[in-house]
A protein has these predicted regions:
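A structural signal for short, hydrophobic/glycine-enriched beta-strand patches
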Residues: 1-186
Length: 186
């Protein structure tokens, strides 16, 4: 396979995984596609990609949802997140902190924002969803629409897991980033 075909194949896979149901995370885009300007809930799932925090901050600043939640305990990406966050933002405390706590501190430090809820017990994709649903029930947060924001490689998996447990809500995907590879120098 030549390099361009390989790049095209990688880009096809990346576009599939990094599902975004909206062209932009905006009230206008929500209104056009779903008929409402504000989702009931937006959830950022932890991971090692800091830009997810920026996506959530932008959504919070623009009133995209009624409630904002960060989900993430300690799992296989936690130490990488700690290392990257500490390297980029040493002011954000990371030692012995859960992913949700790290992202919450980042939101506070960089944007002066605080999510409504943190879920810090999750350790993997499956219990990210089940623990989120328990939190929503426990806190009596009703929702008919939910925006999921996750590392691009895990976005579709998070969507599929939620659909196993919650079939009556509008599930809106917005991967935290999208990438494309290019061939340079042949």
């Amino acid at each position: 396979m030549d390099n361009q075909k390989l790049a095209d194949a990688i880009n096809t896979l990346a576009a599939f995984c990094a599902c975004r149901d909206l062209p932009a995370l905006s009230k206008e885009a929500l209104k056009r596609k779903y008929g409402f300007e504000q989702a009931d809930v937006m959830v950022l799932f932890g991971g090692s990609i800091i830009c997810g925090g920026d996506v959530l901050a932008n959504a919070m600043q623009n009133g995209i949802a009624k409630k904002y939640i960060v989900v993430g305990g300690e799992g296989h990406t936690t130490q990488t997140l700690r290392n990257q966050m500490h390297a980029c933002f040493p002011e954000v405390e990371t030692e012995n902190r859960m992913e949700a706590e790290i992202f919450s501190s980042y939101l506070s430090f960089r944007y002066g924002l605080t999510p409504d809820y943190l879920e810090c017990a999750s350790t993997n994709c499956g219990n990210n969803i089940t623990n989120l649903l328990c939190l929503l029930r426990r806190e009596q947060v009703p929702f008919q629409s939910i925006i999921l924001c996750q590392d691009a490689t895990m976005q579709r998996r998070m969507d599929a897991t939620l659909r196993l447990y919650q079939t009556d809500a509008a599930i809106i995907n917005f991967a935290s980033y999208q990438v494309q590879v290019v061939v340079k120098n042949g």
